[in-house]
From Swiss-Prot:
Binding site for ATP: 230-236
Name the record gives this protein: GMP synthase [glutamine-hydrolyzing]
Ranges where the Glutamine amidotransferase type-1 domain occurs: 4-202
Gene of this entry: guaA
Pathway: Purine metabolism; GMP biosynthesis; GMP from XMP (L-Gln route): step 1/1
Organism (species): Thiobacillus denitrificans (strain ATCC 25259 / T1)
GO MF annotation: an example: ATP binding
Disulfide-bond pairs as recorded: none
Length: 520
C-alpha cells in the first residue's frame, strides 16, 4: 500500500504540476476537487495534504474552502497561493485584496527557522539573509497570521509570503513551488513530502504498470476495446498497455485522415500489426476528412470536425465489433488542462482538444483514458516499462488533429502534401545533427500565403513554411530552441530545393507563454 499525498484542487492552471512534482519525488498522490467529503478524506488516509492555488478571493461570498477535516486530521498541510489564503482565513487569520498584485518573478526573504525552508535559498545577502527567486501569481494577500503561526517568508509587496505553524505542521506559501520558475520549488516540495510528511519513495513506474493493468482489467472485464492508433507516443503507449492488460480484446483502428506525417501509415502497420501482434484495422478516410474540412478555416471548427469524424469512423468500426463497449484514447494531463480542468471545471478554457471536447452524447462506447492522469514524461517512462522501443517512446508529440492544425486556415490536400514533405526534411536534419533529442517538440507549419522568390533565372511565387522547435520540461511553459544557423540554413535549402511549391522558410522564435506551442 502506497503512502499517499492528497492534493485538493481549487482551480489553478498549475494544480496538475503539483502532482507531477510529488510523483517525481517518488511519492504517490491523487488530485481531487476541494469540496470532497470528510469521509472521503479520512478513507483516503493521506500522509499529508496540499491545497492548490486558484482564481477566487477568499473574502468573497461562496468561495471554495478546504474541508474542516483537513485541519483536524493531524497530518501536515501545505497551502499554495489560494491554498495558503484559505488556510489563513479558515484558521482565524485575515486576507485582503493586495494594493500591488504580483504576477511573475519575485524575490523573497526566506526565514530559515522553519523546517520547510531551513537551508533552502538561492543566495545570501550581505546581511546574511537567505533569498529565494520565486514565481508569484496573486491579487490577494494574507494580512494577519492565524494563532500559532509565525512568519516564514516575506518581501516588500507581500509582507506575509509564507507562514508556518510547526506544532501542527501547517505551512503556507504565497508563491508557486510547483513551477520551474521557482528555482528551489522542487527542493521545497521534496522537503514537505519526505521530511515533514514522512513519505518514502515507494511509487515508481513498474509499480504503476501493474496498478494500471489491474485497473483496466477491472474496468473492462470481458468487453472488447477499440483504440484509435496514430503512431504517436500517447496512442502507442495506450496500445501497449491495453494489449498487456486485455490481449485480443483490444482492436486498434488506424485512421488515415490524410493529415498524417510522411509514411506514417506504413510505419504504424509494420510496428504494431507485424512486430507486436496487435490487431489493427486500417481505415483510409482521407476523402471523408478532406470533404468535411473543405472551406473551413477557423482552428476550433477544424478541431471539432476532425474530432467528430474520428468518432463517426470509430462508431462505424464498432458496429463491426459487437462486443466492443469501450473507446480508448491517449488523453494525458496537458490535454485536460488546456481544455479546462476535467476534475473541477474551474480552470479557464484555452483551446479545445479533440480527445476531450468532441464526443457527442450519442456515442455508444464508454470512454477509457488510462493515461489521463499522466504527464508526457511519465507516459514515456510507462512506454519504456512496457517494453516499447526507445525511438518510438521518445518521438516528439503530434497533435490529434494532425496536420489539420499545422496548416493555417483552409485545409487542402495540396497543402498537406507540401507540408508533410517539408516536415520530414526538418525532422531528418534534426536527427542527423543530434538536435532532435535536444528539443522537446519540432515541426513545420504551412502558411497559406505566397511570396516572391528567384530560382535560377526565373521568378517564383510560392508558399511559405515556418519551422518551430521548442524546449520544455513539462509543456506548460516552453522556450524556443536556439538551433544553429548552419542547421537552419541547411533545412531551408533542402526544403526549397526538394519541395516544389515552397520558396521561403522562416523560424518561429516565440515562447509559451505568450504563444502556444502549436500555431492553431
Amino acid at each position: 500500500m502506497h503512502q499517499k499525498i492528497l492534493i485538493l484542487d481549487f482551480g489553478s492552471q498549475y494544480t496538475q504540476l503539483i502532482a507531477r512534482r510529488v510523483r517525481e519525488a517518488g511519492v504517490y498522490c491523487e488530485l481531487h476537487p476541494n469540496d470532497v467529503s470528510e469521509d472521503f478524506v479520512r478513507e483516503f488516509a493521506p500522509q499529508g495534504i496540499i491545497l492548490s492555488g486558484g482564481p477566487n478571493s477568499v473574502y468573497e461570498d461562496e468561495t471554495p474552502r478546504a474541508p474542516d477535516v483537513v485541519f483536524t486530521l493531524g497530518v501536515p498541510v501545505l497551502g499554495i497561493c489560494y491554498g495558503m489564503q484559505t488556510m489563513a482565513a479558515q484558521l482565524g487569520g485575515a486576507v485582503e485584496s493586495a494594493a500591488k498584485r504580483e504576477f511573475g518573478y519575485a524575490e523573497i526573504r526566506a526565514r530559515g527557522h522553519t523546517q520547510l525552508l531551513r537551508d533552502i535559498q538561492d543566495r545570501v545577502t550581505g546581511e546574511g539573509h537567505g533569498m529565494l527567486d520565486v514565481w508569484m501569481s496573486h491579487g490577494d494577500k494574507v494580512t494577519a497570521l492565524p494563532e500559532g503561526f509565525k512568519l516564514m517568508a516575506s518581501n516588500a509587496a507581500t509582507p506575509i509570503a509564507g507562514m508556518a505553524d510547526e506544532a501542527r505542521r501547517f505551512y503556507g506559501v504565497q508563491f508557486h513551488p510547483e513551477v520551474t520558475h521557482t528555482l528551489q520549488g522542487k527542493h521545497i516540495l521534496n522537503r514537505f513530502v519526505h521530511d515533514i510528511c514522512g513519505c518514502g519513495s515507494d511509487w515508481n513506474m513498474p509499480d504503476y504498470v501493474e496498478e494500471a493493468i489491474g485497473k483496466v482489467r477491472s474496468e473492462v472485464g470481458s468487453d472488447e476495446v477499440i483504440l484509435g492508433l496514430s503512431g504517436g507516443v500517447d496512442s502507442s503507449v495506450v496500445a501497449a498497455l491495453l494489449h498487456r492488460a486485455v490481449g485480443d480484446q483490444l482492436t486498434c483502428v488506424f485512421v488515415d485522415n490524410g493529415l498524417l506525417r510522411l509514411n506514417e501509415a506504413e510505419q504504424v502497420m509494420e510496428t504494431f500489426a507485424q512486430n507486436l501482434g496487435v490487431k489493427v484495422i486500417h481505415v483510409d478516410a482521407t476523402e471523408r476528412f478532406m470533404r468535411e474540412l473543405a472551406g473551413v478555416s477557423d482552428p476550433e471548427q477544424k478541431r471539432k470536425i476532425i474530432g467528430r469524424e474520428f468518432v463517426h469512423v470509430f462508431q462505424e468500426e464498432a458496429e463491426k465489433l459487437p462486443k466492443a463497449k469501450w473507446l480508448a484514447q491517449g488523453t494525458i494531463y496537458p490535454d485536460v488542462i488546456e481544455s479546462a480542468s476535467a476534475k473541477t471545471k474551474k480552470a479557464h478554457t484555452i483551446k479545445s482538444h479533440h480527445n476531450v471536447g468532441g464526443l457527442p452524447e450519442t456515442l455508444h462506447l464508454q470512454l477509457l483514458e488510462p493515461l489521463r492522469e499522466l504527464f508526457k514524461d511519465e507516459v514515456r517512462e510507462l512506454g519504456i516499462a512496457l517494453g516499447l522501443p526507445h525511438d518510438m517512446v521518445y518521438r516528439h508529440p503530434f497533435p490529434g488533429p494532425g496536420l489539420g492544425v499545422r496548416i493555417l486556415g483552409k485545409v487542402k490536400r495540396e497543402y498537406a502534401d507540401l507540408l508533410r514533405r517539408a516536415d520530414a526534411i526538418f525532422i531528418e536534419e534534426l536527427r542527423a545533427s543530434g538536435w532532435y533529442e535536444k528539443t522537446s517538440q519540432a515541426f513545420t507549419v504551412f502558411l497559406p500565403v505566397k511570396s516572391v522568390g528567384v530560382m535560377g533565372d526565373g521568378r517564383t511565387y510560392d508558399y511559405v513554411v515556418a519551422l518551430r522547435a521548442v524546449q520544455t520540461q513539462d509543456f506548460m511553459t516552453a522556450h524556443w530552441a536556439e538551433l544553429p544557423y548552419t542547421l537552419l540554413g541547411k533545412v531551408s535549402n533542402r526544403i526549397i530545393n526538394e519541395v516544389r511549391g515552397i520558396n521561403r522558410v522562416v523560424y518561429d522564435v516565440s515562447g509559451k507563454p505568450p504563444a502556444t506551442i502549436e500555431w492553431e
